[in-house]
Every structure is written in C-alpha cells, then in structure tokens.
C-alpha cells in the first residue's frame, strides 16, 4: 500500500467509530448553517472566491431545475391522424411523441415496483432509548469509572467473533444474549423453519445498533434458506434471503421472523 494511504489502511484494519454514520449525518445537516455563516462573515479575497463558487452552484442548480421542469411538459402521447392539412413550422414538433414524459413515467413505475418489492410486514416500530438499550458498567478499583456499556438486548455476532481485551472493550455483548438461529415463517408456503442467521442487514433504531448486531423488533436480518430449496429463474439455489423480526427477542427468548419474498 502506498505511504500516503495510511488513513485507508487504518480504516481497513480497525474499522470506523461506532457513531461514524451518526456524526456524518449531523455534519451534513450542519452544512447549511456553515455556508450561511461563511456568506455573511468572509471578507476580501476569500469572500470573492466563496461568492464565485456559490454563484456557479446556483447557476448549475437553476439549469437542473429548468431541465427537470421541461421533462414534465405535457404533450400528445399519440400523434394525430394526418388529415391532409398543412401545419406551420412551429407546430410540426407537437405531433411527435413526448419522450420525456414516457421516460418520467417509466422511472416512476420502476420506483413503485421497487418500493413494493422491498415492503416489509412492520413498516413502523417503537423507538428504544439508550437507557433501555445499554446498561452502565462501573469499573476501576473503587468502581468510579463508568465508560463501559453492556447491551441488554439480544445480539448476533457471527462465527469468527472474538472479544477485545477486557481493558479495551467498551461495549459488552453478553454470551447468554447471543442468537445464532431464528424461527423464520414463509408467508406464501405457511411453514416455519429454524434457520441460521447470516447477518444483520438493518436495525431501524440506529446505524450503530446495526453495526453491533442488535436484534430488536423490526430488524432486517439475512438468513440461510438453502434448506428450503428455493431456486432462482436461472436455476441457481438461493443461499441467503432477508427476513424481518416480528417479536421482541429479549422478552420471548427466541427470534421469530417473516421471510421477505
């Protein structure tokens, strides 16, 4: 690896901070405030450069908006029959099919199909507070340090998981609350199978919980469905499919999920 890519090397070896996605989202949300402050306070050469950059951005945005509005121009979807009358030059293009409208409608149709494909049984779930999710662990000789946290919900850690050294482990995932398999129900076949979990795709509570593998109600998990014998249109065996957890694993002691088909 080149010497100047030490940041990428560190990310590959140690990963990112647990709250990286949250910090990134907040930084993007604050960007508008920073731009407004710079526009008011920058003086001299830096102010001129900033104004020039903002001007070019606004011009590009106006062009983009204008192009988007032109794509919505209504026109005849089918050309009229030729009745033998001559048309003036400025009316000749009105007989052509409006391709922009056709492209726009096809994009909307694809979006609707995609939304229908990835619709889930539980679109909304109740939020979980950090006080309920994490338990504070007191450490140190006199038990005065409180930088450690223990997850009180069920988690999935994977096969090759090894704990960090005790002195460096900030978040503890108890062995008794780790799950490896789930009771997955196929909605069309109406059967329930005990399938191994491959990974946690998305936890609706927070990206940090997704990275930690926390299993709560509404979480999307990937399960091994090779035992069901599902095949694709090309004849290949389906290995993993997504499922959504429909129960509270920490209350029931098991994971129940519905397969997303």
Curated annotation (Swiss-Prot):
Subcellular location: Nucleus, Nucleolus
Top-level taxon of origin: Eukaryota
Role summary: Involved in the biogenesis of the 60S ribosomal subunit. May play a part in the quality control of pre-60S particles.
Protein name, per record: Ribosome biogenesis protein NSA2
Organism: Meyerozyma guilliermondii (strain ATCC 6260 / CBS 566 / DSM 6381 / JCM 1539 / NBRC 10279 / NRRL Y-324)
A Pfam match: Ribosomal_S8e
Binding partners and assembly: Component of the pre-66S ribosomal particle. Interacts with NOP7 and RRP1. Interacts with RSA4 (via WD repeats).
Homology family: Belongs to the eukaryotic ribosomal protein eS8 family. Ribosome biogenesis protein NSA2 subfamily.
InterPro entries in alphabetical order: NSA2_fam, Ribosomal_Se8/biogenesis_NSA2
Gene Ontology terms: biological process: maturation of 5.8S rRNA from tricistronic rRNA transcript (SSU-rRNA, 5.8S rRNA, LSU-rRNA); maturation of LSU-rRNA from tricistronic rRNA transcript (SSU-rRNA, 5.8S rRNA, LSU-rRNA)
GO cellular component, one term: preribosome, large subunit precursor
Key words of the record: Nucleus, Ribonucleoprotein, Ribosome biogenesis, rRNA processing
Gene this chain is encoded by: NSA2
Biased composition (Basic and acidic residues): 1-22
Motif annotated as Nuclear localization signal, chain positions: 15-22
Residue ranges, annotated region (Disordered): 1-39, 61-85
